[in-house]
A protein has these predicted regions:
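N-terminal leader/linker segments that precede catalytic domains of diphosphate-processing enzymes
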Residues: 1-123, 131-178
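Juxtacatalytic substrate-recognition/specificity segment
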Residues: 126
Length: 178
């Protein structure tokens, strides 16, 4: 939540993974409806039994005002062949906190989750486009969006000090996932 009243956004997150996401979203329509109906009946929320892994996506803007789009492989499980910004998923393992004091752990975990959300969009941009991390500026959260299946993504604005030609060179030199 959060919004027009000026309150900061509030997200409630649980743990899930890509395999669970595929298992609850890329299934027969009747099976999906049954899961959604169960969620409505059991929890008053159609998406309660869906593994909606939180994604992150960047609108990468170059110093000369160009936005960078990537075409998704036809081999991926979802949205193959479509264009989007550098995107991926935060790594929950980077937000794990251990210790005995529950209150201290909760505060530290919240900070780690927040840091991971922002760090993951920079790492995905670096890995997919090849722009060095030191050439990327701090991300700005633009909002939250959902794809047609209900999977949520955080959308960030990420600026680079590189111009479009330099970004093309980074990409051509071999992004880590390219």
């Amino acid at each position: 939540s959060g919004g027009a009243d000026g309150a900061p956004p509030h997200l409630e997150l649980g743990l899930t993974g890509y395999r669970e996401y595929v298992g609850t979203h890329l299934i027969d329509a009747s099976e999906r409806r049954a899961l959604e109906d169960d969620g409505e009946r059991d929890h008053g929320e159609r998406g309660a039994h869906m593994a909606n892994a939180l994604g992150c996506e960047a609108v990468l803007v170059t110093s000369d005002g160009h936005a960078v789009l990537l075409r998704r492989s036809g081999e991926v499980a979802t949205h193959g062949g479509l264009y989007n910004g550098p995107s991926g998923h935060p790594e929950p393992s980077r937000a794990v906190v251990e210790g005995d004091d529950k209150e201290t752990r909760a505060v530290e975990a919240a900070a780690r989750v927040r840091n991971e959300l922002y760090a993951s969009v920079l790492m995905e941009t670096h890995e997919e486009v090849g722009v060095p991390l030191e050439k990327l500026k701090a991300p700005t959260l633009l909002g939250v969006m959902a794809d047609p299946t209900g999977k949520p993504d955080l959308l960030f604005l990420v600026r680079t000090e590189l111009d479009a030609a330099a970004v093309r060179e980074c990409y051509a030199a071999g992004a880590e996932e390219g």
